[in-house]
């Protein structure tokens, strides 16, 4: 499969994959959670630098609050948090007198909190198969629907970064009628390391460079 890849990134990579037939296009959206805009200036990121040089590098303004769940669901729906319902990683539900939390599966998996229409549902309405790896909302029955292929966040075993890439590549190797044309892939780093160690630290720098190497693996394969 020939791959023509362009990039627009802050914490987000957009990979456009063009298959052998020119009329069939594949898009892989990759999130490196917590990847600061200036990390490529602070640390060695040759793969991201190469993608920016080959394609496009653009400014992205996050939605507010700039937290994982509201921002990733904004990217999926095109709606700001107060319109799509996920207004923070944790918030108080006044109507039902309970707390929503990304760490509480009972509320996190409740579709009544998720408004709007994620892009994978829109794509499937157009007859496009989709694949989703750990993106916010993808394992929840929003509008009684799931992506064609997806991995629940609480499924065991929890996949390593390398296993996630292998799974995505397996999806892309399916026979064309079964192959997802829209794939969304989430990595929770370097967010965790940045919070724990601070952005200007050797451990965070090592994680940033590791995430860059994974982008290189995804491009190469």
PLM region spans:
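Solvent-exposed, acidic/flexible segments
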Residues: 24-29, 37-45, 64-69, 109-116, ...
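His/Asp/Glu-rich, glycine-adjacent segments
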Residues: 80-207
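Short, structured active-site-proximal loop/turn typified by the sulfatase FGly-forming signature C/S-X-P-X-R
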Residues: 40-84
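Beta-strand elements within well-structured catalytic alpha/beta cores of enzymes
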Residues: 24-36, 50-51, 75, 123, ...
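Generic, well-ordered alpha-helical scaffold segments in large soluble proteins
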Residues: 171, 218-221
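Coil residues (strongly favoring Ser/Thr
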Residues: 20-23, 50, 55, 105, ...
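Extracellular/periplasmic catalytic domains that process cell-envelope and extracellular macromolecules
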Residues: 20-23, 42, 66-68, 124-125, ...
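Bacterial Sec-dependent N-terminal signal peptides
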Residues: 1-23
